[in-house]
């Protein structure tokens, strides 16, 4: 179902992404969906997930990209800062099942994007509010982070990465340990097999030599 309302994309933070996707505004007040509809895959493409992705997959993609493009990891990169902002804005929509459903149906309005948030319905709905992106800590001259005394919160990448990727890192660590143990076991078995083969061959030649000597003496 196509959207029936005009979206004020020039006022929306998500407008920049649709503009990059080649959808110019139809007027100075916004994009009217009566004439055209916005792309329903642009936000998914931005996060690098298919439109059929689960909420868990969307969340994982958001954490991964927000970590990679965080301005503190890319000082002085306007492109990274812009990508970080777009990823955060995309997750504000796709991270909410209610806003995502509206987006998929072409019903997402500017009011939805500018609102304080989706109000919970009377019936229980498993739709936790999407987490905000990691805080952006402006850097002081010289590239160093501003100190806590400046009134800003320093961003701890180690804590962020451990909080969202700790379980995955632990699984990978256990997997590497199992692979290493299996490799050593196979090497030990191969060494034992080689040692046994050498012993067997040596024994065979000794027996053959003794038989030859015994037959020689008999003759």
From Swiss-Prot:
Transit pept. (range): 1-38
Any one of the GO BP annotations: ATP biosynthetic process
A matching Pfam family: DnaJ
Gene Ontology CC: one annotated term: mitochondrion
Tissues where this protein is expressed: In brain, expressed in gray matter structures.
Localization annotation: Mitochondrion inner membrane
Protein name from the UniProt record: DnaJ homolog subfamily C member 30, mitochondrial
